[in-house]
Design a protein with these regions (language model features):
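A preference for well-ordered globular domain cores
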Residues: 101-103, 117
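Short, helix-capping/interhelical loops that line the mouth of catalytic, cofactor-
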Residues: 63-89, 137-185, 244-251
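Alpha-helical packing segments of well-folded alpha/beta enzyme cores
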Residues: 89-96, 100, 132, 173, ...
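Amphipathic, non-membrane alpha-helical segments in soluble helical-bundle scaffolds
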Residues: 83-94, 119-126, 174-181, 220-223
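Charge-dense, helix-prone N-terminal extensions
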Residues: 95, 105-107
């Protein structure tokens, strides 16, 4: 088998002509302006952003978007551009997450600390969403330079920053994490409830040490990032809960 070399620092990949790749898990890889000629894909799972991807002359992006929206009608509402749109999207997310949390409670508590296929556990997912809300709403929108809770969890590839918690070894209970989450959800809900059309056209700046450090960043984009994180991570959580439920039944 030909070895595949991935250089994540420059986000490039060197794959020799005629390479044969089997049983390989490729993560966090970006392909831009790439042509695959004579490609054979069999029993392949692709999860990620698909844009301007043509297969055998067909742009598959719109087809995938339409099918995902058909399967999940709420998905089309996760690209808000108006005050009412953000309010609707956040209400949907809180409703959906309530059902996911109820489902998680039916599992043994120790399984909520168990990742599936190297992904975050359910508890870690909630901790990361707490981090995202603190970063983009607490810090960027509300201007609190240090909005963190000790259980907040940045993404795995984050460089790390002084003063920002990053404890991958913590094992808090579901109720403990949800206690933080309720406060963060309320914070976002209150910001969105008070949102005005004028604010959606404004920019925000935070240059104090930490992350994010941005100047004149669109306020609407801060809110959209949180909406996007909440939507996608719930799908991942539901997928992994399915796997954990199956494992529990088999045992």
């Amino acid at each position: 088998m030909t070895r595949v070399v991935v250089m994540t620092a420059s986000i490039t990949a060197s794959i020799p002509r005629g390479a044969h790749v089997e049983h390989t898990d490729l993560r966090a890889i970006s392909f831009h302006h790439v042509r695959f000629l004579g490609l054979e894909l069999v029993d392949v799972e692709i999860t990620g952003a698909i844009e301007d991807v043509t297969i055998n002359g067909v742009d598959i992006g719109p087809l995938i978007e339409a099918e995902l929206n058909r399967r999940m009608p709420d998905r089309a509402r996760m690209h808000p551009t108006t005050v009412e749109g953000f309010q609707e999207a956040w209400a949907i997310l809180e409703r959906l997450w309530a059902g996911t949390e109820d489902r998680a409670r039916t599992l043994p508590p120790e399984l909520l600390h168990e990742g599936v296929r190297g992904e975050w556990s359910f508890i870690e997912t909630l901790r990361h969403l707490d981090f995202a809300s603190a970063a983009w709403v607490g810090r960027m929108v509300l201007g609190d330079p240090v909005p963190w809770h000790p259980l907040d969890l940045p993404w795995d590839e984050a460089p790390g920053w002084e003063g920002i918690p990053w404890d991958r070894e913590a094992r808090p209970s579901l109720d403990e994490v949800l206690g933080v989450r309720r406060k963060r959800q309320a914070m976002v809900r209150e910001v969105i409830a008070a949102l005005t059309p004028e604010q959606l056209d404004e920019t925000v700046t935070c240059t104090e040490p930490g992350w994010p450090q941005l100047e004149d960043f669109p306020l609407a984009q801060c809110l959209f990032i949180v909406v996007n994180e909440e939507w996608h991570h719930r799908l991942y959580a539901e997928r992994d809960l399915d796997a954990l439920v199956t494992t529990t039944k088999e045992n």
